[in-house]
Amino acid sequence: MAEKITQYLGTGRRKTSVARVRLIPGGQGVEINGKAMDEYFGGRAILSRIVEQPLALTETLNKFAVKVNVVGGGNSGQAGAIRHGVARALLLADESLKEALREAGFLTRDSRMVERKKYGKKKARRSPQFSKR
């Protein structure tokens, strides 16, 4: 006999960050790499709000404990990756949330990446200063 699912898994990506998210029904709080969310992001409230957006939108903020393992990139990219992963995990928990999450854009992988530096240029597009004489 199949057991009832006790947790929902979702993988999120943003820039070079990859987040593996577990939603556990009945718990509360967000734990990132073994630390509390506020501690992990160093008190940057905007990043905490980004992570909680899918939960707030679907009114499931206090219904799930969120445990995250995230690697790569910086704080902003990691927050975006976690948001993507949480949205995907919520979809597994409740299929009826798909329309709201899709409309808010939380299920779409943000494909923007850093443009590579080209030879003969100082950065990706910045050219060396031009001198007529």
From Swiss-Prot:
An example Gene Ontology molecular-function term: RNA binding
Record's protein name: Small ribosomal subunit protein uS9
Location of the region described as Disordered in the Swiss-Prot/TrEMBL record: 114-133
GO cellular component, one term: cytosolic small ribosomal subunit
Top-level lineage group: Bacteria
Bias (Basic residues): 118-133
Source taxonomy: Bacteria, Fusobacteriati, Fusobacteriota, Fusobacteriia, Fusobacteriales
Record-stated family: Belongs to the universal ribosomal protein uS9 family.
Matches recorded under NCBIfam families: PRK00132.1
PANTHER family, per the entry: RIBOSOMAL PROTEIN S9 (PTHR21569), SMALL RIBOSOMAL SUBUNIT PROTEIN US9M (PTHR21569:SF1)
GO biological process, one term: translation
Pfam family, one: Ribosomal_S9
Gene3D superfamilies referenced in this protein's UniProt entry, alphabetically: 3.30.230.10
Keywords of this entry: Ribonucleoprotein, Ribosomal protein
Disulphide connectivity of cysteines: none
InterPro entries, sorted: Ribosomal_Su5_D2-typ_SF, Ribosomal_uS9, Ribosomal_uS9_bac/plastid, Ribosomal_uS9_CS, Ribsml_uS5_D2-typ_fold_subgr
UniProt source species: Fusobacterium nucleatum subsp. nucleatum (strain ATCC 25586 / DSM 15643 / BCRC 10681 / CIP 101130 / JCM 8532 / KCTC 2640 / LMG 13131 / VPI 4355)
